[in-house]
């Protein structure tokens, strides 16, 4: 079962983590309070690990910073998230 965790519209940078102050809150003990940042720049999606305890991975590869493409698996701690880049009007 997939759970859709949409990034709030109207921004180009989103913080992900366990704390409620994040743009996307993911409640799991293996995720740091402020774990990673997703950023959209010139139609390219980037993710940056923010010195998290358990790391950030794209398709199994540990990264400090990397490019996200449609269908990638983004792992924060032990939580896998499917990255889906939607066009306006497209649904998951």
Say what each PLM segment does.
Residues 1-30, 89:
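N-terminal beta-hairpin/loop module of FHA
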Residues 9, 40-42, 51:
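A generic beta-sheet turn/junction motif
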Residues 15-18, 40, 46:
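Structural recognition of beta-strand segments within beta-rich domains
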Residues 26-27, 34, 58-59:
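Thr-Gly-centered strand-to-loop micro-motif
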Residues 29-32, 52:
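Loop/turn elements at beta-strand to alpha-helix junctions within RNA-recognition modules
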Residues 36-38:
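Buried hydrophobic-core signal for structured, non-transmembrane domains
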Residues 46, 53, 57-92:
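C-terminal boundary/linker segments immediately following FHA domains
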